Regions:
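Amphipathic, non-membrane alpha-helical rod segments
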Residues: 167-169
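Polyanion-binding surfaces on beta-sheet-dominated domains and ring/shell assemblies
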Residues: 1-164
Length: 169
C-alpha cells in the first residue's frame, strides 16, 4: 500500500474528504446529538494510511478489591520513531461496563489509549473531515438518543457533504 503524503493544505482537504466518505459509508463513527465521533478502527485506518502504527507499551492492572481497573499506554510509531502517545483507563464501575469481564476492561483501556494517541496526532485531519476529535470509545457515558427526524437530517447532511457541527441545515 502506498502511504498518503500530506504536504499542502489542499492535500489535507482532499485526504479528509476521502476519509470522510469512507468512514461514513463503512459506519466507522457514532452520531451523538448530530456530531460524528469516530471509532478506533477509523482512527487506525487513517493512521495506517499515513504510516503510523500503535504499539501498546504498557497495560497495568491497577484494580482494587472492589473495582477492576486497567491503565494502558500506547505509542504511535512512524518510520521507527515515536510520534505520539496516549494513556487511558477503564474500569468496571463505568456506565455500561458493570458486567464486563476483566479481559474486556483491559481491552477497552487499550482501545481508548490507541484512540487518544491518534486523536492527539491526527485529530486536526479528522476535524477537517467534519468529525469530532474525541474518539467514540471515550463517549460511552453520553446519552446518544437522537430523534428519528434529526437522525434523518444528519444522514442526509453527511451524504450531501454539507454537515454542520449540530446536524442542522
Amino acid at each position: 500500500m502506498e502511504l498518503v503524503k500530506i504536504e499542502t493544505v489542499d492535500d489535507v482537504k482532499k485526504f479528509s474528504a476521502e476519509i470522510k466518505k469512507y468512514i461514513f459509508e463503512n459506519k466507522m463513527f457514532m452520531d451523538i446529538h448530530g456530531k460524528g465521533y469516530i471509532f478506533v478502527d477509523g482512527w487506525s485506518l487513517v493512521g495506517g494510511m499515513l504510516g503510523v502504527t500503535p504499539i501498546v507499551r504498557e497495560l497495568e492492572n491497577i484494580s482494587d478489591e472492589t473495582t477492576i481497573r486497567y491503565r494502558s499506554t500506547v505509542e504511535l510509531i512512524k518510520d521507527g520513531q515515536t510520534v505520539g502517545m496516549g494513556i487511558a483507563i477503564c474500569t468496571n464501575k463505568e456506565k455500561g461496563k458493570t458486567a464486563f469481564d476483566e479481559y474486556a476492561v483491559a481491552s477497552m483501556a487499550q482501545t481508548r489509549a490507541i484512540g487518544k494517541a491518534y486523536r492527539i496526532y491526527i485529530g486536526w485531519i479528522m476535524k477537517m473531515a467534519g468529525f469530532q476529535t474525541t474518539p467514540a470509545e471515550e463517549m460511552d457515558s453520553v446519552d446518544t438518543t437522537v430523534s428519528p427526524e434529526k437522525l434523518k437530517k444528519i444522514v442526509e447532511a453527511y451524504q450531501d457533504g454539507n454537515d454542520t457541527s449540530d446536524g442542522t441545515e
